[in-house]
Amino acid sequence: MKNNKVLVVVGPTAVGKTALGIDLAIKMNGEIISGDSQQVYQGLDIGTAKVTKAEQALAVHHLIDVRKWTENFSVHDFVMEANRLIEEIIERGNVPIIVGGTGLYIQSLIEGYHLGGQENHQAMMELRETLLALTDEELFEKVLKLNPNFPELNRRRAIRFLELQTFGSTDENSGSDYNFLLIGLNAERKVLYERINQRVEQMMSEGLLSEARSLFEKAPDAQAAKGIGYKEFFPYFSGEISLEDAVELVKRNSRRYAKRQLTWFRNRMEVEFEDVFSETYPDSVFEKVTQFLN
């Protein structure tokens, strides 16, 4: 029987997913598939914390630099491409390793969502936030109106059911054919937020402002321009705010995004988180992965 095992590394921005993914790829004969919605764009290297050329030389990476700034990349595109790549990687006898923090991408792949190519990412996020804010009673009331015989009333299944009613197929056989091991990375909030702030300062020293200005001048309305680390500078380029304020916006929005990422993975997916500052990390991860693959 053909191996169908896939590793998935998730967690908030700046927690260390890239480093772990590369370590796993080296140790487990793996190839990395990026699960980041911004790293698909060519030339947006600094603000997306894209893997460097040196890092890419250590392990094979996929779905990096596959779109121009003016091109869109949807959840549907990701699921189609990721499934194709997983199949090819397994055929080569290697281990597919999904690494990224875009929760909607990861969940859609794992649960086999059939979202149309024209799906609206923003609408999906807004619906998710609305459903998460409901009480159990309110949530289950919505579900039972649509399906009085809904088999199991738990929040995760109820939310998924309502999203599928709105955005995709509810075919019970639409799940993925692969066996996924989810590895979640996290750190104490204060420490994580400090790492985020430091990363933004490092990005500034590496030329983030120039990268953002180029995007502002050439493709300000593109999907690529909506990412954190770019859009915050547009008011500065227009003379509306100071550079200092723009940098603080990047830091604030990055911290808020990290919080949303954690909320998504905790509420939507079966993830066991590893503290990246634990004495047993990363050996604890390698042990889990070895057991899973064997």
UniProtKB/Swiss-Prot annotation:
Keyword set includes tRNA processing:
yes
Gene3D superfamilies in the cross-refs: P-loop containing nucleotide triphosphate hydrolases
Cofactor dependence is on:
Mg(2+)
Q: What are the entry keywords?
A: ATP-binding, Magnesium, Nucleotide-binding, Transferase, tRNA processing
Q: Which residues form the signal peptide?
A: none
Record site: Interaction with substrate tRNA? T102
Q: Where does ATP bind?
A: G11, P12, T13, A14, V15, G16, K17, T18
Binding-site positions, substrate:
T13, A14, V15, G16, K17, T18
Q: Which Pfam families match?
A: IPPT
The GO terms this record gives for MF are: ATP binding; tRNA dimethylallyltransferase activity
GO biological process, any: tRNA modification
State the NCBIfam families in the record.
miaA
Return the HAMAP family for the record: IPP_trans
Q: Could you tell me which PANTHER family the record lists for this protein? A: TRNA DIMETHYLALLYLTRANSFERASE
Per the record, the similarity remark reads: Belongs to the IPP transferase family.
Q: How does it assemble?
A: Monomer.
Indicate what this protein is called per its UniProt record: tRNA dimethylallyltransferase
